[in-house]
Amino acid sequence: MFRLDIYGKIEKSCFTQKGRDTMGTERILTERLILRKMVVADHIQMFRHWANDPAVTTYLTWEPYENAEDVAAYLALNEQAYQSEEHFYWGIEEKETRHLIGAISVVRCHPEIKTMEIGYVLGTDWWHQGYTAEALTAVVDYLFAATSVQRIEAFHDAENKNSGNVLKKCGFTYEGLLKQRGKNNRGIVDECLYSRLRD
């Protein structure tokens, strides 16, 4: 089994489902959002709404895409990865406008301790409106219901305070600061670690 994470790497999947007829990236509806599988036809919106924006990628590990064709190639790989029942990657679509405004996914798994790492990205036009928290809450609830995961964790650049605020809003607990733990478009950075455990 393999999956493509939000940063474009294909990795081994790692955890079991809990007796569901359907698995993987299922469609999730929230008050304002549709969380769904992404397809190659989404490449223009992904490119325009976040993948080409340096303001979005400042704290991320990948550089802004230079053209929509490269985004299409990435999404083609992602479509292949959906064949795995253990690939979790949602596009975040605004219900009212049907705009694709971001993405959220499981980016790493640690099967031996039943832990997953989650990541998310949102276009700047939709920042500070509660969309990330709404999507994150829905995905975390889904993962705890659908899989045997016991711990979901997230890391963010210590300078990216907004990401920490989202995690706290969604019930994650701050566990500490890891010095020079990560590398992103700002260079080598300190990272904050948050987690949420199964109730």
Regions found by a protein language model. Name each.
Residues 77-91:
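A short helix-loop-beta-strand connector motif used in the catalytic cores of GNAT acetyltransferases and
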Residues 2-45, 49-54, 89, 93-199:
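Acyl-donor (CoA/ACP) binding surface of acyl/acetyltransferases
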